[in-house]
Amino acid sequence: MVTWKDAPTRTVDVDGIRFAYRELGCGSDVPVVFLHHLTAVLDDWDPKVIDGIAAHHRVIAFDNRGVGATGSSVPRTVEQMGTDAIAFIRALGLEKVDLFGFSLGGGVAQMVALQAPDLVRRMILAGTGPRGGGGIDQMTKIVGVAYAKAFISRKDPREFLFFPRTPEGKHAASDYLARLHERTRDRDKKFSLQARLAQLKAIVHAGKSDPDDLSVITAPVFVANGDRDLMVDSDHSADMARRLPNARLKIYPNSGHGGVFQHHETFLADALRFLANEGA
């Protein structure tokens, strides 16, 4: 079976814009569409997670507008990112999907569910929270501090943003970043500074927005986070889970924003049970 490191990059026309995506996994009636995080391109998905899901489901991951190999520019709002995601999904001829949104992607997934509820069967929202509050409007400062630490120490910013600076967290960060480089051919275009700034503005705008009425999202949702998330506090994730009428919550111990990657084996078991409607 094709794995993430070998999956070919394809494109599809979405209202005149070429969207880059990759697809793999076994055939299933409802594919799982992956929505990625701040400053991420296709190559930034953890192969352990994406291959683990693809062993049981058809998986589709894509670069949203203005990101990586996809054309145009990054939208000004997370809401518009959701609109673009809907357009991409429909351009593939899909009528029903499961969504896996990590971080910013979790916010985009919520917008998809709010704008096109009939399109979404189930959602996994990891390392994310709802619009409005939760310190999300401070994201520029949080990211800036991490980038400064990374520059001084010559490390990847995700070592500071995604994982706690404990021996266990540092080891998990090293393993995670190594996995991201398993793919050596047909790699995506690098994330541009312009796109990074645009995404940060959209996230800050979401943090300052009025809260959404999440009670209208009736699809089953699995909310996951680490107990030491610096970017989206686990309490904010828990608040989101409480406001979703059909949600379950799991907080992974001794982990941060990337808790689902640090605890990828446990998370995969939880996610697959959830997608199979067996609980999580």
PLM feature spans:
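Active-site loop/oxyanion-hole signature of alpha/beta-hydrolase fold enzymes
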Residues: 60-100, 269
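Short beta-strand/loop motif that positions the catalytic acidic residue
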Residues: 217, 223-225
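Acidic catalytic loop of the alpha/beta-hydrolase fold
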Residues: 228-232
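Catalytic active-site module of serine/aspartate enzymes centered on a nucleophile-bearing elbow/loop
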Residues: 247-280
